[in-house]
Amino acid sequence: MGSNYFTSPLAFIITTLFDLYILLVLLRFILQMLRADFYNTVSQFIVKMTTPPLKVLRRFIPSMLGQDSAAIVLCLLIIYAKFVLLRVLDIPVIAIADVPAPIGLVSYAGLLIYCIADLASLFISIFLVACIIQVVISWINPGQYNPIIGLVNTITAPILRPIQKRLPAMGGFDFSTMVAILVLMVGKMLIIPPIIQLGSF
């Protein structure tokens, strides 16, 4: 067995665990930004899981433009730690939004730029997945409410609202969510590769 026999599973575990926590922190930032229902049970879980490190960071990092800057800094720090650990495991290349990012070949400054790309990719993905969930729910069980649906509606509202103003429902069908998914996918394709290219210099 080669050295990769244990390295690849370990890298997978590290990436999964780090990404899950980054997702929670970024979700907290987005939900605060959108003034989501704090008493929602999912919101409560996210708050409980992310409060301890944010409490520490907020002592040094003030809010900017009314937003929780500490949450963004925490995300970047965790992503950076993830990349450093993957470098230690001798993982030369990872994929960020399906774009190869040679984390083993760039400077630590380049890694920081990759962190921004990874965070931007996750940010877009959250809105994209929320739109997909909304489409699926509208087909399977429209009209039913649960805590997850409440948060999904909160996340998708600022994207769907301007589209719905310009594209009203036609024949009883609302195509705004499909348009939003298309825009988000194209946006991801256009935004992430240049950031990764910048970090690769």
Located regions from the model:
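Selective transmembrane helix interface/packing segments
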Residues: G2-F201
